[in-house]
Amino acid sequence: MSSKLEQLQALLAPVVEALGYECWGVEFISQGRHSVLRVYIDRPEGILIDDCEAVSRQVSGILDVEDPISGEYTLEVSSPGMDRPLFTLEQFAKHAGEQVKIRLRSPYEGRRNYQGILRGVEEQDVVVLVDDHEYLLPIDSIDKANIIPRFD
């Protein structure tokens, strides 16, 4: 996770948690002159639109005061959804056994994209089984990771 994302996570997580939600993760996507700050919230009973609105109001207030992002951006608050992104080793461990899609920042063992069964974590590595081969992917090399929902 980049230092900018770590800074945003550290700023926003206490606000989200004070409202009774888990701050699942934060993404900042630069899109030219206009960017998107996406905050994922979760709780055991699920997330409703009213929850997103309440968190958005509080987070927006903190962002206005602290002003950690230069330039224009849109704030989006949502649940992680069925294809939830994974950000932390704890999240990867919690979802062991599920299908995942992982994209690395740069190639590792000759490839950048991995899709397979999440086996868990070992120290600072995410373990994924792809075509009967187990890969240990350093958490710091992961650009994006998502659960692949099953519909069976």
From Swiss-Prot:
Keyword Cytoplasm: yes
One record GO biological process: ribosomal small subunit assembly
Keywords from the UniProt entry: Cytoplasm, Ribosome biogenesis
Keyword Coiled coil: no
InterPro entries (alphabetical): Ribosome_maturation_RimP (IPR003728), RimP_C (IPR028998), RimP_C_sf (IPR036847), RimP_N (IPR028989), RimP_N_sf (IPR035956)
Annotated coiled-coil segments of the chain: none
Primary role: Required for maturation of 30S ribosomal subunits.
Organism: Pseudomonas aeruginosa (strain ATCC 15692 / DSM 22644 / CIP 104116 / JCM 14847 / LMG 12228 / 1C / PRS 101 / PAO1)
Compartment(s) where it occurs, according to its Swiss-Prot or TrEMBL record: Cytoplasm
SUPFAM superfamilies xref list: YhbC-like, C-terminal domain, YhbC-like, N-terminal domain
Main location: cytoplasm
Recorded superkingdom: Bacteria
GO cellular component terms attached to this protein's record: cytosol
Family indicated by similarity: Belongs to the RimP family.
Protein name as annotated: Ribosome maturation factor RimP
NCBIfam families: PRK00092.1-1
Pfam families cross-referenced by the UniProt entry: DUF150_C (PF17384), RimP_N (PF02576)
